[in-house]
Regions:
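Alpha-helical transmembrane segments of multi-pass membrane transport proteins
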Residues: 1-422
């Protein structure tokens, strides 16, 4: 009864505009007071332990790296380079958006940050080539979600920290699924562009322009190679490489491209601090409510119910996907991971599901959550950039939403895609 009441209170607080972390903190405090044998001091102790984590230190640095790339206008450079050869195809500029999304995903690990950076760099160009506003907003919004799957993913960092999985293995697991998702989106862009005659088509690929622009783009192109290569070569941990990424982005922006000023770097640092504070606040609030749920035996009870239900592994995963998709309508990605991971991973273990595979499934659901009304953050980001209503952005996302659901099904029922490097 306490749990049901807590859920109702959380939903009410969110509906009236209370910040997620505050809502979770209020409900947790109430549940602690109503639960026998749990001292109130446990709130401070558990909250501190939840954010006093070495792996979580990677989050502010990766966020800063993404913001510095955005301030340094690196998206413009990558778009111009790729566009010289890709725009020979129908829908070439939209394809360029997706290629650039993959690049940003391999550096920042943030969905919203990628969508904001790429949207600011491409929307005017998409409009000039007569792409409808809602299609332009939709393709950038859905491309931004790749930042959650392709390493270094903030989602994988959170999951690894919460359930104790190696973050470098989670990063490896996200490579094939991320590239698969990008490929499916590219095919859908080509199909829709041909069907509705979107965009202009260059007569020939501009290879001269490509090789002219390539030398200048090399420092930016090296960034994801250095970031991921350092992790997988064992040179740096994910936390260490996050700091390297931020410093590298700052140096090439200040001294090589000269597109970042001191004031711009300060703004990037300030924005990163605000974004990280919000993430940490949700981590703190979610860990508190997760602790009390475990203390009340909710996780153990769910495992017991699951053992008696006699479900097959695929039936369990189907139910999990439905639950996460529904919750994704009302919770942002960080909150969704923090609230559900402590409950779902023990259940997945009972079903004999590889935890790395299950982590990929969870991140794939979080990607879709960022596109799902009424909370989908990428919808609001693109609504602000393109200056169209959120429901119009949602209409633009709809064809790609179907593609993402198909991709989710593939990742769910073909574990080898997630375990390719295991």
């Amino acid at each position: 009864m306490i749990i049901i009441g807590g859920v109702i209170v959380v939903l009410f607080l969110l509906m009236i505009g209370t910040h997620v972390a505050v809502a979770l903190g209020i409900v947790t405090a109430g549940m602690v007071l109503l639960t026998d044998g749990v001292p109130i001091t446990v709130i401070a102790q558990t909250g501190f332990k939840s954010v006093n984590s070495y792996p979580l230190m990677a989050i502010p640095m990766f966020v800063l790296a993404g913001n510095l790339m955005m301030k340094g206008q690196l998206a413009h450079m990558i778009i111009e380079l790729i566009g010289t050869v890709v725009r020979v195809l129908r829908g070439g500029l939209a394809l360029t958006v997706l290629f650039t999304s993959v690049f940003f995903a391999a550096v920042s690990g943030s969905s919203v940050g990628s969508a904001a950076a790429i949207g600011a760099a491409t929307v005017d160009g998409l409009r000039r080539e007569k792409y409808p506003d809602r299609f332009a907003a939709g393709i950038v919004a859905v491309g931004g979600t790749l930042g959650l799957m392709i390493p270094p993913s903030l989602g994988f960092i959170l999951i690894g920290t919460i359930v104790g999985l190696p973050i470098d293995r989670l990063f490896l697991a996200g490579i094939v699924p991320g590239l698969l998702e990008a490929t499916l989106l590219m095919f859908s862009v080509v199909f829709l562009s041909h069907k509705y005659n979107y965009g202009t088509v260059a007569k020939t690929a501009d290879f001269r322009g490509f090789f002219t622009k390539l030398p200048k783009a090399i420092p930016a192109l090296l960034m994801p190679i250095l970031v991921l290569g350092s992790i997988y070569a064992g040179i740096m941990t994910p936390t260490e490489v996050s700091a390297f990424a931020a410093v590298y982005a700052l140096l090439i922006g200040l001294f090589f491209y000269r597109t970042i000023s001191i004031s711009g770097a300060w703004e990037a640092a300030r924005d990163s601090l605000l974004q990280t504070t919000m993430i940490y606040a949700v981590v703190l609030g979610g860990s508190l409510i997760g602790f009390i749920l475990v203390r009340m035996g909710v996780s153990a009870h769910l495992v017991s119910v699951l053992e008696q239900a006699d479900l097959s592994w695929w039936q369990f995963l189907l139910i999990v996907n439905v639950v996460l998709l529904v919750l994704g309508m009302f919770l942002d990605g960080v909150t969704l991971i923090i609230l559900t991971a402590p409950l779902l991973f023990p259940m997945a273990q009972v079903m004999g599901i590889n935890p790395i595979h299950f982590a990929v499934i969870m991140v794939a659901n979080v990607e879709i959550a960022t596109l799902t009304p009424p909370i989908g953050l990428n919808l609001f980001v693109m609504s602000g950039i393109v200056r169209i209503p959120v429901h119009e952005v949602a209409r633009g996302v709809l064809p790609f939403y179907v593609v993402r659901l198909f991709g989710l099904a593939l990742l769910t029922f073909i574990p080898q895609l997630s375990l390719f490097f295991e």
